[in-house]
Design a protein with these regions (language model features):
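Divalent-metal-activated hydrolytic enzyme cores
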Residues: 66-89, 93, 97, 124-163
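Short catalytic/ligand-binding loop motif for oxyanion handling, primarily in non-cytosolic enzymes
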Residues: 18, 53, 110-114, 157-159
Length: 163
């Protein structure tokens, strides 16, 4: 490939960055190896970048009359507004960054692209895989034509990413 590499947004933990709630990463060497020479990765961790720190308590998605909320599992504290403030700013940045695609971390309350487990208020019962991570949902709303996958789509999705 000559010239500039295409820009691909990616959940930072998939590149081995230790930004997850437990202080670890979820490195996906296959993604890196397949794409490293063809793309410029733009790593993003909504929870860390929104100031929630590392490590941080686990969170989950809850259904509420106000929509899907991101809740700290141990305390019930609602982190949705903090994340949404960051997401609003980040989506504007993504518009200027000209990314061609995004690779999300599956099942994450912020980055889950496919249905993420959704709970009733107070995590009393699972409503099943019905939700979508807040950041992933915002990206889909704002960039409906963009190719978006999660790490479970590899290696098949790599062919689409490097057309």
């Amino acid at each position: 490939m000559h010239g500039r590499k295409i820009k691909i947004g990616i959940s930072a933990c998939l590149l081995g960055i230790k930004c997850r709630y437990d202080g670890c990463s979820k490195a996906c060497p296959l993604i890196f190896e397949l794409l490293k020479d063809k793309v410029q990765f733009i790593p993003v961790c909504p929870e860390f970048n929104a100031g929630l720190g590392v490590p941080r308590p686990p969170m989950h998605l809850e259904s509420s009359p106000r929509g899907t909320r991101v809740i700290v599992t141990s305390t019930g504290e609602d982190k949705t507004d903090i994340l949404n403030d960051w997401i609003q700013t980040e989506v504007k940045l993504m518009e200027r960054t000209n990314i061609a695609a995004f690779i999300f971390k599956a099942r994450s309350p912020s980055c889950g692209l496919r249905p993420v487990e959704l709970f009733s208020p107070g995590k009393k019962r699972s409503l099943g895989p019905a939700g979508q991570g807040l950041f992933a949902a915002a990206m889909k709303r704002n960039f409906p034509e963009m190719l978006m996958v999660d790490e479970s789509d590899f290696p098949d999705a790599a062919k689409k990413l490097v057309f």
